[in-house]
Amino acid sequence: MKLVIFRSLMALFLITTMISCSSGKSGNEVSNPSNSQTTPVATNVAATQGKIQFKTEGGTELFALKQEADGAKLVDGKNQELARIKADKSGKIKIKNAAEKVLGYVVNENGEWKLKDANQSQDLYIFRTQNNGGYTLEDAAKKEVYRIQATKDGFEIATPDNKSVYQVKVKEGKISLRKTPTKTIFSTKSQLSPIAFTCFGFDVLTREQQAGLAYAVNLTGGK
C-alpha cells in the first residue's frame, strides 16, 4: 500500500514539474518579441535625421545636406546629388561627387581642419582656431584668406585687412548668411552649429568643399 502511495506522489510531482517548465518556456517566447524591438528603435532615431536646408529669403531652397547614417549627401535645389560626404575608418572626411570620384578630404588635427586634395598629398586650405576665440582660413602657403571673429549674435567673415565679407547672424533659431545687415544670401532653421554654417561663406571654396568642411567642423562643434 505504501508503495502505491509513493508511486502516486512521484507521478504527481513529475506532472507538476512538466507543467512548470512548459509555462516558463511560454513566458520566454512571449518576452522575446519585446526584446527584438530595441534595434528598430535605434534605426528610427537615425531615420529621423532629416535635411539641413539652405533657403533664400523668399523661401526657395538653394541646396541641402541630407543626413545619413555614415555621413551626408549634398544636393542642389532640385534634389540632384552634388557630393557625398563620409567618414572613413581613420576618421578622415572623404568628399566624393555623384559619380563616386574622390574630390578631396578633410582632416581634423589639434584644432585645425585641413582640406586636402584627392591624393591627400597637398593641403589646399587650413581652417584653424585662434587663441582669441576666432578662426582663420589659410591657403596652401599658410597665407590668411579670411578672418572669422565672434560677434554678439554670430560671426563675421573678413579679409586679412579686416574688410567685412559676410555676417553670420543667429536669431530665434535661424542662422543667416548676410552680405549686409539687410541683404540675406541664404539661411537655415535646421540644426547646425553657427561656426559650421560659417564655412558656407568661404567663397574661395567650391560648394562641395564648403559642405565637407562644414560637416567636419559640425562634428566637433568647432573645437
Write out the residue ranges for each language-model feature.
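Bacterial N-terminal signal peptides that target proteins for export
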Residues: 1-9
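C-terminal motif of bacterial Sec signal peptides marking the signal peptidase cleavage site
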Residues: 17-20
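Intrinsically disordered, low-complexity proline/glycine-rich segments
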Residues: 24-223
